């Protein structure tokens, strides 16, 4: 049993909870997720099973797309709806669509972001949420993130009320804290804010409409059709730049042979496939030999090599 399961993560579960539950359903220990989703967030969570755990690190590097809701009027300890209220300030003026769109435009591009205290980022060997739960504030590292697209989904021209909510879509780089973006939006509009709802609709090429629920996985497990919920390793990696090698080269790949970067791809890594469209290995740019590639992860051995 191996491959990638596109789980439609339910609300209220951590990513670790999802892995634990899937281990019980599939009766498989080698399972790992491809990036943390907060308990309040639902949506696309790719989970690697069996030999596919070898490729988890390559699936986490993909851009993510979310649809969510920002609420102005109060902020929380966790920057989302699950936290305790920290600051309250009624929205005492009309906010226009143009104002919000201008803020979203300002937050598009390369930004600096400080991760929230309630997060899994480690400082001095401890996760930030461990400090937060102990009532300790520590200096947090600044991250460089990229917001590729930030769109207002609400079609109203004006927003009024003590608490104002509006929906958005954002496509961003790995490591972006979208709930922190909600706080940043509030700051620029002059009011405390938090993320009141969030759904991950895409992780790289993986889309929400392709995801399956725990119930569907359990049903397929009982019916003996569980393989239908898996995406193969080859398919999961097929969207990345690739080099196709012949039989002679394929035989040498498993021994870590260097390759020429024949396609001149500038991406961090390049996949290597045989002529039967089977992924043999994942390569990266050689740090000392320009134009050459060296193996990062070999996915085949003598028994697994399929030619």
Curated annotation (Swiss-Prot):
Alphabetical UniProt keywords: Isomerase, tRNA processing
Disulfide pattern: none
Active site: 38 (nucleophile)
Listed Gene3D superfamilies: Pseudouridine synthase (3.30.2350.10)
Origin: domain of life: Bacteria
Pfam families: TruB_C_2, TruB_N
Top class in the EC scheme: isomerase
Keyword tRNA processing: yes
Enzyme Commission identifier(s): 5.4.99.25
GO process terms (BP): mRNA pseudouridine synthesis; tRNA pseudouridine synthesis
Stored PANTHER family: PSEUDOURIDYLATE SYNTHASE TRUB1, TRNA-PSEUDOURIDINE SYNTHASE
Family statement: Belongs to the pseudouridine synthase TruB family. Type 1 subfamily.
Task performed by this protein: Responsible for synthesis of pseudouridine from uracil-55 in the psi GC loop of transfer RNAs.
Name of the protein in question: tRNA pseudouridine synthase B
Species in which this protein is naturally found: Bacillus cytotoxicus (strain DSM 22905 / CIP 110041 / 391-98 / NVH 391-98)
Name of the gene: truB
